[in-house]
Amino acid sequence: MSEYLFTSESVSEGHPDKMADQISDAVLDAILAEDPRGRIACETMIKTGIIILGGEVTTSANIDYEAVARETVKRIGYKHHEMGFDGETCGVINILGKQSVDIAQGVDRDHPEEQGAGDQGLMFGYASNETDVLMPAPITYAHRLVQRQAEVRCNGQLPWLRPDAKSQVTLRYVDGRPVAVDTVVLSTQHAPDLTQAQVHEAVIEEIIKPVLPEQWITGETRYLVNPTGRFVIGGPVGDCGLTGRKIIVDTYGGMARHGGGCFSGKDPSKVDRSAAYACRYVAKNIVAAGLAERCEIQVSYAIGVAEPTSISVETFGTGRVDSEKLTRIVREHFDLRPYGILKMLDLIRPIYTATAAYGHFGREDEGFPWERIDRAEEIRDAAGL
């Protein structure tokens, strides 16, 4: 019998790095809504009283970037000066430039099927049958905790909560399956007039217990709520936020490998984003088809070249079909060229702001087409099962 612990973390929409991600993706969506051919690489930095937008944009759209940034911050909940950051009054500096023509000539083609990758790189996608959304359990429940924190903050159930929060979930695994919650950490920003005891009780009863599976809670489960004792100063006042700083939160919580490229602020011509989504789509359909209990896909590209330089499939000993055959099936049934991905997943749409908090994967809301399992039957038939 194999027994071990595994931990993943998440952060709320009001965490400064996630605020930066959401601003970058709000800029992306604003451009795509007016100019589907726009090329965007928008980076955001946010700190006390100021938002800085940088990066490269080529578009015919006329965007009020300052208004996009302010509205995003206010939607998250930073709209009163007593929180230390106010979307109405903060400064916004825009230093967005144009995309290099050297990159554009490698990406743009007369025939869209020949569209080259916007950069070299490697991307991964992963799926596991340990949750209903075919994601690793630790990151799934870490996300659900901070989503619940936002829910009870916004619906007035716990009105003294503030937007910044972090969660961390440690699960006990036996023979590769999660069986118990070992430790939960939840740190949440709050109003200054709350005691630690009040915060501790409310967080456990109103956030943690409604989210975690009851059968996984044991007498040894530990709850660590605001373990420093106080969390009043938060958001961009407490920490500087930058786009792309939460790439493990965005993906699989450390359970799968990562190619290093972030997602937010990048239009879908950039394979850092689109190919990672495609890899998740492929891996999820393989697991949904019953071809493996766990599956990780790697794909790589060269700048300006349409065909992937490599595709590999790893099933960690859980596959019902050998990896060589699975790789052939992937090549035959999924077009992983940049334009093929855009078409397959219908990515040239303003759908990205919603991805920028609570994870890009395991989300079954509208606007996450890479979470569909519509190819499962097709590839199961191809495998002869």
Swiss-Prot record:
UniProt-recorded name of the protein: S-adenosylmethionine synthase
Quaternary structure and interacting proteins, as annotated: Homotetramer; dimer of dimers.
PROSITE patterns linked to this entry: ADOMET_SYNTHASE_1 (PS00376), ADOMET_SYNTHASE_2 (PS00377)
E.C. number(s) listed in UniProt: 2.5.1.6
Catalytic activity: L-methionine + ATP + H2O = S-adenosyl-L-methionine + phosphate + diphosphate
Main function: Catalyzes the formation of S-adenosylmethionine (AdoMet) from methionine and ATP. The overall synthetic reaction is composed of two sequential steps, AdoMet formation and the subsequent tripolyphosphate hydrolysis which occurs prior to release of AdoMet from the enzyme.
Cofactor note: Binds 2 divalent ions per subunit.
Species classification: Bacteria, Pseudomonadati, Pseudomonadota, Gammaproteobacteria, Chromatiales
Entry's Gene Ontology cellular component terms: cytoplasm
